Regions:
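Low-complexity, intrinsically disordered segments enriched in Ser/Thr together with acidic residues
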Residues: 1-15, 114-148
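Serine/threonine-rich, low-complexity linker/repeat segments that form flexible spacers/stalks
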Residues: 2-62, 68-72, 151-194
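Short, surface-exposed beta-strand/loop "edge" segments at domain boundaries and coil↔beta transitions
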Residues: 16-21, 91-98, 126-133, 163, ...
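Gram-positive cell-envelope targeting signals
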Residues: 40, 49-53, 62-67, 118-122, ...
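Short, hydrophobic/aromatic beta-strand segments
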Residues: 61-68, 78-81, 199
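Short, ordered, surface-exposed loop/turn motifs in non-cytosolic proteins
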Residues: 62-64, 193-216
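A surface/secretory-pathway sequence property marking extracellular, secreted
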Residues: 70-117, 205-216
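Hydrophobic beta-strand positions
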Residues: 89, 155, 189, 204-205
Length: 217
């Protein structure tokens, strides 16, 4: 079906046309609007990830707006120098959102970033101030097939309570076996005399990232 216009509809039974007509088609409703919404993707090498934060599709006026972001998956860090801030007008048409009349305004703002967090003070946002913040991140280890990279963005202002948007990038490796995070382990705890040891605690740590997967007794 085209997004808008007339579309042919034909029903056949046993290779015989029973119903043949034209119907009018179009996009139903409007795209959902969020104060911010996060999207992320794997650039193909499973090392470089791309992210975008779409800001103010809701046409809000926010005083002293601050946008923050945190990388929640260990071993993944922002790529220095990759941050871009664009300003324009968010428009929903033909089933997709586009930032029309996009202008690069990166030089007008300061990105305060560490390896895994950043903040941008957007100042006083009017209802007509629409933004897209784009950046890249680096996976500093060999990711496994079906691994999920998690990331969260938040916007807050004097008249705006913290509003979050979460993003998940699914790593899909061609020929992967779908191992993901599935694992099993059995531990028999004994003392120096090979007797069962009570009250001992241990952690399961992922060697690639140092992430603690669990603590057990």
């Amino acid at each position: 079906f085209p997004n808008d216009g007339n579309a042919p509809v034909k029903f056949s039974v046993n290779n015989k046309v029973k119903f043949d007509c034209t119907v009018k088609s179009g996009t139903v409703g409007e795209g959902k609007r969020y104060t911010i919404i996060k999207s992320g993707w794997d650039n193909g090498d499973h090392k470089s990830l791309g992210f975008r934060i779409s800001v103010n599709r809701t046409n809000e006026a926010i005083s002293n707006a601050v946008l923050s972001d945190s990388m929640e998956s260990p071993g993944v860090t922002y790529k220095a120098g990759s941050f871009k801030i664009y300003k324009g007008t968010w428009d929903y048409s033909n089933g997709t959102w586009q930032l029309k009349n996009k202008t690069d305004v990166t030089s007008q703002y300061t990105v305060n970033a560490t390896d895994t967090t950043f903040t941008i003070n957007l100042g006083n946002i009017s209802a007509n101030d629409h933004f897209a913040v784009e950046y890249e991140a680096v996976v500093n280890y060999d990711a496994v097939d079906r691994e999920v990279i998690k990331n969260k963005a938040t916007i807050v202002g004097d008249n705006k309570k913290p509003y979050d948007s979460n993003s998940k990038v699914n790593i899909q490796i061609a020929g992967g076996e779908g191992v993901g995070y599935a694992f099993g382990i059995q531990v028999h705890k004994v003392d120096e005399s090979n007797e069962p040891l009570k009250g001992a605690k241990f952690q399961v740590i992922r060697q690639a990232t140092g992430q603690v997967l669990g603590e057990f007794e």
